[in-house]
Amino acid sequence: LWYAEIKYGTGVVPRVEDRKWGHMKVIVVDVQKGITDARLYNYEGFLVRMKRLLTAARQSNVEVIYVKHDDGPGSGFSVGDEDFEIADALAPMEGEKIFIKEYNSCFSNKKFEAYLEECEENTLIVVGLQSDFCINATILSAFDREYRIIVPKGCNTTFDNDYMDGATTYRFYNEYVWPDRFAQCISVEDTIHLMLGQRRLAI
């Protein structure tokens, strides 16, 4: 059962928790040197949770895929620029795939989209930067493609903006926009438990 209808106000929306479970991949979005720094909301906590999650994924044989954003030549945030590179603290392991996108959603890179389709995965663990831009766009794009999406708490973050500080923006998406409607927002511990369950099924 891919969709189960529930009443939501005056409309009807699908319940994301009723989508089928499948094999997982971790999608690490835009953790690049130019934006992965102490300006982010709860930066140190973000790093701790990310490292724990990535270590558990690798130990569970859950594939980790990185996606980097390219703002174009001359922007200072493009191929060849130091700020474009992945932050050392969250660097990929040898052999892990890295895709480059030019728009907010990871699915704007058609090779990324084709790779997921080829692997026949249907559960994506989406983490990284920024909650209100590329993370949100990727979650909505994945939902439209009928993926089941997991958002581990504290594994995405963002900056202050002209309307909300980083903490409020984080809460707006993680506690209001995404839960139940577009994604399952669960603890890092529960996410790791699910990954370990996948490893047991694969043995």
Question: Where would I find each of the regions flagged by the language model?
Answer:
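Short beta-strand segments at enzyme active-site cores
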Residues: V28-V29, E63-H69, P152
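Short, well-ordered beta-to-alpha junction loops that form the rim of enzyme active sites
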Residues: H69-D70, L129
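Active-site-adjacent betaalpha module
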Residues: A4-Y8, E17-K25, R52-S60, F77-I203
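Glycine-rich, proline-tolerant flexible connector loops at the mouths of alpha/beta enzymes
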Residues: P73-S75
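Short acidic, Gly/Ser-rich segments with clustered Asp/Glu that frequently serve as metal-coordination loops
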Residues: G34-D37
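A short alpha/beta connector and helix-capping loop motif
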Residues: R39-A57, N61-Y66
